[in-house]
Swiss-Prot record:
The family this protein is said to belong to: Belongs to the prokaryotic molybdopterin-containing oxidoreductase family.
Function noted in UniProt: Reduces trimethylamine-N-oxide (TMAO) into trimethylamine; an anaerobic reaction coupled to energy-yielding reactions.
InterPro entries to which the protein is assigned, alphabetical: Asp_de-COase-like_dom_sf, CT_DMSOR/BSOR/TMAOR, Molybdopterin_N, MoPterin_dinucl-bd_dom, Mopterin_OxRdtase, Mopterin_OxRdtase_prok_CS, Prok_Mopterin_Oxidored, TAT_signal
GO CC terms of this entry: outer membrane-bounded periplasmic space
Annotated Mo-bis(molybdopterin guanine dinucleotide) binding sites: S179
Localization, UniProt: Periplasm
Reactions catalysed, as given in the entry: trimethylamine + 2 Fe(III)-[cytochrome c] + H2O = trimethylamine N-oxide + 2 Fe(II)-[cytochrome c] + 3 H(+)
Keyword Plastid: no
UniProt enzyme class: oxidoreductase
A Pfam family the protein falls into: Molybdopterin_N
Gene this protein is translated from: torA
MF-aspect GO terms: electron transfer activity; molybdenum ion binding; molybdopterin cofactor binding; trimethylamine-N-oxide reductase (cytochrome c) activity
Protein name: Trimethylamine-N-oxide reductase
Length: 820
């Protein structure tokens, strides 16, 4: 619909001009307006819903929709994604792979590629699928990598790829994810569900009833800018109310964190420093105080919990380690004075206390333990299931805590084969290997094929796969230890990547296919990941750029090569699918939510169902644990898990325990050589690695063209480093360059480089310096424990120095080196 700029601005006049997460987008976007007429289209993203001004076939301007009262500044980066110099423009094949085929792995990563036609690229892709299934079998193909993808119900790129590849033959896949691998594995044993992705107690209930809120390694102001679906940013209104209550002294908020994070600075609440990776000793000492001073809720423990006696015997030093977990024992480990530990423990039981855990704390060696120990502390407080009390593991994620309307969102494109379908290569012989592996252990498969590892009560035999198909995700961002990955990728015969951006994953691939962005195709999506506020039409803004195509079209053309395209698509077009998903959604919500016919919805673009009713997590369990049991083996909170105990694991035993790390700062193992803890948390200006390629937006935070490294001024002074200097950060695993930002928000001995920075090695050789600042160049690739085998990225210590050599160019961006 073509409209004038004046009528559009009249339509958005109700949008808030202020945001707790940054300056208003309305002010900054209007300054960039270049035309007075044009077409305005609604679309969405992980960063929120917006209207885009289209003129002369290009996106000129982006504004948040009226419903978003707290838009993120990251909407300003969307144009930079669409028009990034790092777009995958054409089908590309790695030069040496094309010349020598699978025998060229030693040059993988040199970024030298040849442009080919779509037919040539898809023929090569299909040929490799055929070869691998014929020569080896399904165990030799890994097509299970996943990530955040882009938003949209129909255009889930992983679903499209896995359905198409699955129609050809079976393959290796994964279980778990990088975000919450340890947490989602341990918590079902303790609280009966993964908890990390569960709707939590409504913010309104917390604000009305809580006396104390503990933000434990939790930074919602930073992390709620993005959502799994199209985000509404409704949580920020509650955070603004919380700020007012903190200022008035109505709620006591304490951030337990090694750093003063963005939320703490916004709320201006108290900060309790804890040494990195030592939260468990702190929690054990809290439990000791609550028990020895008889402050814990004995009735709650007896009514709702099992296994308290075994745990408290450990805390009292009555088990095999013979160490009493007193505040005096914990203080030199965690860096909190014994008297402060006692004061904090006593505060927890004065009034209603809501503990809000973050995810960063479980992405470490023994990452299961802090989540388990925190649940035990919450149980001892005795307020689980009460408004404003208990524990949550998700209030920083995708608007968890905003009441859900109950609207059932649309389904998606089917990932699996339809009933009765069989793949072309109907072979289920995985040669004795496991067909499903823990997500963070896939590099182990390449370096130690055939090795048997423990995992969550079972055994996994690591498959010796030869080929990978990667769609819409960037494992060269989210996995750890880049130089180990380089060694592992030399074992692969073929890597096919389908993406719209030339990431490091493309650099280390053999065949790269150009997908279009989500703004070059149509879709629909839930508006509000957990609030389910409504439904949004995601209109195609511009035609696919260069030779890029929607994933649906790419995979349809692949399946044509073995006669399965009609089965793959069910004979439906993109808009047929979107209409069908909408109509199915309308039917499933009949009698609950009024939805117009599809054409009216598509023109209207946004359906708003308002807000849901407040809710309290675990309230039904507290009301009657026998009628409403938890999903644990006993139905109760399991402080001690006999099931885990029977596994006989060394690093995850039957109740929460303190395990020393393989490396730790502040006096821990290895700190004499590498004394600084590297925190690689979720970024403030990206969604993981998404938007790093957006040049103008990246320039708002990069330092001399590099990723920032945040350093305490005293640590910087000791090394002769000033604001803006280039810094070499290093350990025995790798080295990188980053730009120094000096700030008192970080204590001595702690530095931060946010994850998602694009890896840009100087060359393909093992040990080459990363020119931009990817922290996973330095992190270690070990499992959290035998239970979850999850990522341990935050068990990482480093050293740093001012860089004085010849400054290399950044190699992360701009696409491949095209060879004629």
């Amino acid at each position: 619909m073509a409209i004038t700029r004046r009528s559009f601005l009249k339509g958005v006049a109700t949008t808030s001009a202020a945001s707790v997460i940054g300056p208003s987008l309305l002010a900054s976007a209007s300054a960039n307006a270049v035309e007075t007429t044009g077409t305005w289209k609604v679309s969405g993203s992980h960063w929120g819903a917006f209207r885009a001004h289209i003129y002369a076939g290009k996106v000129q301007e982006i504004k948040p929709i009226e419903l978003d009262q707290n838009p993120t500044e990251m909407l300003n980066g969307i144009k930079g994604i669409i028009y990034s110099p790092s777009r995958v423009r054409y089908p590309m094949v790695r030069l040496d792979w094309l010349k020598k085929h699978k025998y060229s792995a030693d040059t993988r990563g040199n970024n030298r590629f040849v442009r080919v036609t779509w037919d040539e690229a898809l023929d090569l892709f299909y040929r490799e699928l055929e070869r691998v299934q014929k020569e080896y079998g399904p165990w030799a193909l890994h097509a299970g990598q996943t990530g955040w993808n882009q938003t949209g119900s129909f255009n889930n790129c992983t679903a499209h790829m896995q359905r198409a590849v699955g129609m050809h033959g079976n393959y290796i896949t994964k279980v778990g994810d990088y975000s919450t691998g340890a947490g989602q594995t341990i918590l079902p044993y303790v609280l009966g569900s993964t908890e990390v992705y569960a709707q939590g107690t409504s913010w309104s209930e917390i604000l009305e009833n809580a006396d104390n809120i503990i933000l434990w390694a939790n930074d919602p102001v930073k992390n709620l800018q993005v959502g799994w679906n199209c985000e509404t940013h409704e949580s920020y209104a509650y955070l603004a109310q919380l700020k007012e209550k903190v200022a008035k002294g109505e709620i006591n908020v304490i951030s337990v964190d090694p750093v003063k994070n963005k939320t703490q600075r916004y709320l201006e609440n108290d900060h309790l420093y804890v040494n990195p990776m030592t939260d468990v000793p702190f929690m054990l000492a809290i439990a000791h105080v609550l028990y020895t001073e008889n402050l814990y809720d004995k009735k709650f423990i007896e009514t709702y919990c099992l296994g308290f006696e075994e745990f408290i015997n450990y805390v009292q030093g009555k088990t095999k380690d013979k160490v009493e977990k007193t505040p005096e024992w914990a203080a030199p480990i965690c860096g909190v004075k014994a008297d402060k530990i006692r004061e904090f423990a006593r505060m927890l039981v004065k009034g209603r206390t809501q503990i809000l855990m973050g995810w960063c704390i479980q992405r470490q060696e023994h990452g299961e333990q802090p989540y388990w120990a925190a649940a035990v502390v919450a149980a001892m407080i005795g307020q689980i299931g009460l408004p404003g009390g208990g524990i949550s593991y998700g209030h920083h994620y995708s608007s968890i805590g905003v009441p859900s309307t109950g609207f059932a969102g649309p389904g998606g494109f089917p990932r699996n084969l339809d009933a009765g379908m069989k793949p072309k290569w109907d072979n289920n012989d995985f040669n004795g290997y496991s067909r499903t592996i823990p997500v963070a252990r896939w590099i182990d498969c390449l370096l130690e094929p055939g090795k048997e590892i423990n995992y969550n009560g079972g055994k996994v035999k690591l498959p010796d796969f030869k080929m990978m198909v990667i769609s819409g995700c960037n494992p060269w961002h989210h996995h750890q230890d880049r130089n180990r990955m380089k060694q592992a990728f030399q074992k692969l015969q073929t890597v096919v990547t389908i993406d719209f951006a030339w990431t490091a994953t493309c650099r280390f691939s053999d065949i790269v296919l150009p997908a279009c962005t989500q703004w070059e195709r149509n879709d629909i999506d839930v508006y509000g990941s957990y609030s389910s506020r409504g439904l949004i039409a995601m209109h195609r803004l511009v035609d696919p750029l260069f030779q890029s195509k929607p994933d649906f079209q790419i995979m349809k053309e692949l399946t044509e090569r073995f006669g399965r395209s009609e089965e793959y698509s069910r004979g439906m077009s993109e808009m047929d699918w979107i209409r069908s998903l909408y109509n199915d959604c309308k039917k499933s919500n009949e009698g609950k939510f009024e939805m117009p016919e599809f054409d009216e919805f598509w023109e209207k673009s946004v359906l708003d169902f308002g807000q849901g009713q407040p809710w309290v997590r675990h309230a039904d369990f507290r009301q009657d644990p026998e009628i409403n049991p938890l999903g644990t083996p006993s139905g109760f909170i399991e402080i001690t898990s006999r099931k885990i105990g029977r596994y006989g694991y060394e690093h995850c035993q039957e109740h929460p325990m303190w395990f020393e790390k393989s490396e730790r700062s502040h006096g821990g193992p290895g700190s004499d050589k590498h004394p600084f803890w590297l925190q690689s948390c979720h970024p403030d200006k990206r969604l993981h690695s998404q938007m790093c390629e957006s040049e103008e937006f990246r320039a708002t935070y990069a330092v001399k063209g590099r990723e920032p490294v945040y350093i305490n001024p005293l640590d910087a002074k000791a090394k002769g480093i000033k604001e803006g200097d280039l810094v070499r950060v290093f350990n025995d695993r790798g080295q990188l360059l980053a730009g120094a930002v000096l700030t008192d928000s970080y204590p001595r001995g702690v530095i931060r480089i946010e994850e998602g920075a694009w890896y840009g090695p100087l060359n393909e050789k093992v040990g080459a310096i990363d020119t931009y600042g990817d922290p996973n160049t330095l992190t270690q690739d070990i499992g959290s424990s035998e239970l979850a085998q999850a990522t341990s990225a935050n068990t990482c210590i480093v050293d740093f120095e001012k860089f004085t050599g010849k400054v290399p160019p950044v190699t992360s961006f701009g696409g491949p080196i095209e060879v004629a």
